[in-house]
Amino acid sequence: MRVKANSKILALIVPVLLSLNSLVCANPVQEDMSAHESLPAAAAPAEVHAPVEVHNAAGTHVETAHESAVEGHEEKAGDVIMHHVQDSNVLAFEPFGEIELPHLQLGSLDISITKHVVMMWVAAVILILVGAAAGAGVKKISVKQAPSGIANVMEALVDFIRLDVAKSNIGHGYEKHLPYLISVFFFILVCNLLGLIPYGATATGNINVTLALSIFTFFITQIAAFKELGVGGYVKHLTAGTHWSLWIIMIPIEIIGQFTKPVALTIRLFANMTAGHIIILSLIFISFILESYIVAAAVSVPFAIFIYLLEIFVAFLQAFVFTMLSALFIGLATAHESHDSHELEASGHH
């Protein structure tokens, strides 16, 4: 049992250590130190430290060499953090090198392949392989047998989305929207987790990706509402059952509300996935900025590992929240007043 526990702990810590190794290899502070050591001896007299005093005769503050060096390290650490979070046309595999992705131009439209596009392709391939493996595992067992392994995990997640997300929020006719909800849940989940492995990137930390997913939810919601309610029912739904004298107020408010929902979905997923990575990298770079192994051992690494484990939970949580809100928006848009009243009457009779 102790060996199994140790192996589980190593399985959690090794990816973090690999990520730290890649960051150390790209550490700008070490590059500055090596460049300083490689200067010729003749240039040494030019490196004169600023005076120890922090105030001159007039009483104004004089910036010391140490302060300027720390500020320079902070700026370069910030550049590295933003480079990791932002999208780019380069796949970096420090210390092994990098891969330049092709630049594609369609007229004035830039359709270049970026690292976030590659991560979405990887997520799609992973989902296809995992889905095929789970399907093969289910086919091999009989009706009386329970699935095991990856098939058991996938069945549990799919049943959770089907019953607790789709059916409970959409109600009648939820089966039509179940494929989209399952697909968007697993796609967001895998994209979130890919950003936590070495050399990976979080595609859902790109606001363009989250906006595209939110637009899918918006159009599916509106199309489902028109099909379910019709044009007259859709307009009546916008008035929210109010008196006609209030329509001039209610209709614009409801129309604005239809567009603010995808905006909320976009910003919520983007902000949560970006913030976690910035916090992890900021904690790691504290030791580099202060140039202290004590700080790294006592603060940076332990807190970074804690946030890393928390981000695994956040990856599942944000995939669930996006899927839940998508199902909720679809359910609100397609709700029938007659169905609701019949359900209330039926519950009252029971």
UniProtKB/Swiss-Prot annotation:
<comment type="function">
    <text>Key component of the proton channel; it plays a direct role in the translocation of protons across the membrane.</text>
</comment>
<dbReference type="GO" id="GO:0045259">
    <property type="term" value="C:proton-transporting ATP synthase complex"/>
</dbReference>
<dbReference type="InterPro" id="IPR045083">
    <property type="entry name" value="ATP_synth_F0_asu_bact/mt"/>
</dbReference>
<protein>
    <recommendedName>
        <fullName>ATP synthase subunit a 2</fullName>
    </recommendedName>
</protein>
<feature type="transmembrane region" description="Helical">
    <location>
        <begin position="269"/>
        <end position="289"/>
    </location>
</feature>
<feature type="transmembrane region" description="Helical">
    <location>
        <begin position="206"/>
        <end position="226"/>
    </location>
</feature>
<feature type="transmembrane region" description="Helical">
    <location>
        <begin position="294"/>
        <end position="314"/>
    </location>
</feature>
<feature type="transmembrane region" description="Helical">
    <location>
        <begin position="117"/>
        <end position="137"/>
    </location>
</feature>
<dbReference type="Pfam" id="PF00119">
    <property type="entry name" value="ATP-synt_A"/>
</dbReference>
<keyword id="KW-0997">Cell inner membrane</keyword>
<keyword id="KW-0812">Transmembrane</keyword>
<dbReference type="GO" id="GO:0046933">
    <property type="term" value="F:proton-transporting ATP synthase activity, rotational mechanism"/>
</dbReference>
<comment type="subunit">
    <text>F-type ATPases have 2 components, CF(1) - the catalytic core - and CF(0) - the membrane proton channel. CF(1) has five subunits: alpha(3), beta(3), gamma(1), delta(1), epsilon(1). CF(0) has four main subunits: a, b, b' and c.</text>
</comment>
<dbReference type="GO" id="GO:0005886">
    <property type="term" value="C:plasma membrane"/>
</dbReference>
<keyword id="KW-0813">Transport</keyword>
<keyword id="KW-0732">Signal</keyword>
<dbReference type="InterPro" id="IPR000568">
    <property type="entry name" value="ATP_synth_F0_asu"/>
</dbReference>
<keyword id="KW-1003">Cell membrane</keyword>
<keyword id="KW-0066">ATP synthesis</keyword>
<dbReference type="InterPro" id="IPR023011">
    <property type="entry name" value="ATP_synth_F0_asu_AS"/>
</dbReference>
<comment type="similarity">
    <text>Belongs to the ATPase A chain family.</text>
</comment>
<keyword id="KW-0406">Ion transport</keyword>
<feature type="signal peptide">
    <location>
        <begin position="1"/>
        <end position="26"/>
    </location>
</feature>
<feature type="transmembrane region" description="Helical">
    <location>
        <begin position="315"/>
        <end position="335"/>
    </location>
</feature>
<feature type="transmembrane region" description="Helical">
    <location>
        <begin position="247"/>
        <end position="267"/>
    </location>
</feature>
<keyword id="KW-1133">Transmembrane helix</keyword>
<feature type="transmembrane region" description="Helical">
    <location>
        <begin position="178"/>
        <end position="198"/>
    </location>
</feature>
<keyword id="KW-0472">Membrane</keyword>
<dbReference type="InterPro" id="IPR035908">
    <property type="entry name" value="F0_ATP_A_sf"/>
</dbReference>
<keyword id="KW-0138">CF(0)</keyword>
<keyword id="KW-0375">Hydrogen ion transport</keyword>
